[in-house]
């Protein structure tokens, strides 16, 4: 089972404040473990523009018509000072990995220098921190009914309002997440 380019949808019974009602986009999943970004937990009072100001990144070709008030997301509890830009594919950045034909992740500063310019990726989200699982841990959490999974949907990823992403991801499975029983059997 490879869950790269899938959503993990927290079951209603998950009460850990880091992951309660979360949707995680899985960026990498292999025999060594998994890594993903929480895509529905905004960091209060932190926008892309604020990040650019703190890092003193000013582009001479900044287009004032391009909004930079997108909220920055709490990508997970690990390396919360490290930035991850999830975006539609665009070549030319120093440290990017293709996740799927519709998404790639970049961790190098050069992508930040394109934000607010005509050269920025078409779709993007910025997250600080990430979530990860060691070998076999995610698979065990799935067996323990901690998460639902579904293939990722770039509309949910980039266009659905943050507060609606948990329900929208569950809707892909044809379910109302609020109607799920906290305990499930394994028949």
Curated annotation (Swiss-Prot):
Superkingdom, natural source: Bacteria
Any single Gene Ontology cellular-component annotation: cytosol
Matches recorded under Gene3D superfamilies: VC0467-like, VC0467-like domains
InterPro entries, per the entry: AlgH-like (IPR003774)
Similarity section: Belongs to the UPF0301 (AlgH) family.
Protein name: UPF0301 protein YpsIP31758_0835
Gene source species: Yersinia pseudotuberculosis serotype O:1b (strain IP 31758)
